[in-house]
């Protein structure tokens, strides 16, 4: 007999037990959050904190309920999106109505730290190209747009409590630029113990490790609570272009802006064709007649390989999103934005010991199903250029791109080709290690694949072509000499160039 992969329905006695356990756990959490609120000493901070704890409790309660009911997607009901739910960028009208820029605001998600690349402070201040960091490039792009079209497109940064203070200092340097930069903070939620499901922090001003920013799905609530959404509407802004702060391909695109206004869509998600490097990326589906974002975490184990298939799920979410501001206001005020919860388990240092914690997060892309006329636009790969690792950093610093008004533009000789696949080993994980080992970026215009592992340094004026693999064993050292040209080679062993 064939199995369908569906779970057995829960018996009534199981439901009753789960329901009681859920109520007890929720009640304990509510009491703990009330106690936390009592520790706020500054009356100006009380309202915001209580509001955040209420929002956290709503999320926590929903997490418990969904966990108890075992609600999951029915894989058999998943369909590919229809032709009006995903449209090709090339089919959009090419007329450029610059007047529409008066309806636009740009938002960069700026809550992340640079710790994964070995840096202290906000990730957005890592230098990526010609002395510019992520924020510098975003400012230059929008400033150029404002000058060219005599516009006044504002830039908003959604910070977290981890990045806010540093970002405020950094943006002072843009005061003389032709751009308005505004910042606001996303929520600060308490981490919870994995075993007891109670909050880690014991007071409002407990250490930073006790708290977490709850993912970019918090954007809608934070926009409204900060007053920034009403301020944008008062300026006549209608559309918010949202992107990850580390995606260097996410520039303002008038074609998509015009298309959104023409169609009246409340939400547009930029998609791009999957490659084997993107098999874990979220994808758009049609589920019971509505457009939804399907993330790998929601996929039953037996269907993960199918989800990764490039044939069935051709596109993935770039997290470049165009969202109608009035629609956000209406949905938030009606408490109507309910998105999938992503439980994130971590081990953190707290006090003198390591503890296992849970943080409940949400993603902004998952809200697509609540907006009218929502659809995906399949954009060129050039609009997705994230910098997550030093391997990505090598790519964006290279001669593959040139800088034009803050935007990275691909060298025309690479048109039609995918970017080279670059894999740098653990010696290059931190920016400091990357910079000391590759002080001069090699020419990679003709490169297809690069792998470097071990104690390797690269000299000045090096060219890499085709497939280049450099493997240095433990205890050995490889110095690639100045001016070397490596083409379709594997370099192993021990190679040190002595200065004479």
Swiss-Prot record:
What is this enzyme's EC?
A: 2.7.7.9
Q: Which residues bind Mg(2+)?
A: 123, 246
Q: Name one GO molecular function term.
A: metal ion binding
The conditions that induce or repress this protein are given as:
Expression is up-regulated during oropharyngeal candidiasis (OPC) infection and during stationary phase. Repressed by HOG1, BCR1 and hydrogen peroxide.
Q: Which residues form the active site?
A: 388
- Give one Pfam family, short name only: UDPGP
Q: Which GO terms describe its cellular component?
A: cell surface; cytoplasm; extracellular region; plasma membrane; yeast-form cell wall
Q: Where the protein is mainly located, per its record? A: secreted
Q: Does the keyword Metal-binding apply?
A: yes
The protein's matches in PROSITE patterns, at most eight in alphabetical order, are given as: INTEIN_N_TER
Q: Which residues bind substrate?
A: 111-112, 216, 244-246
Q: Which CDD domains match?
A: UGPase_euk
Entry keyword Disulfide bond: no
User: Where along the chain is UTP bound?
Assistant: 109-112, 123, 186, 215, 246, 388
Q: How does it assemble?
A: Homooctamer.
Q: Which family would the database say this protein is a member of?
A: Belongs to the UDPGP type 1 family.
The record describes the protein's role as: Plays a central role as a glucosyl donor in cellular metabolic pathways.
Protein name as catalogued: UTP--glucose-1-phosphate uridylyltransferase
The gene coding this protein: UGP1
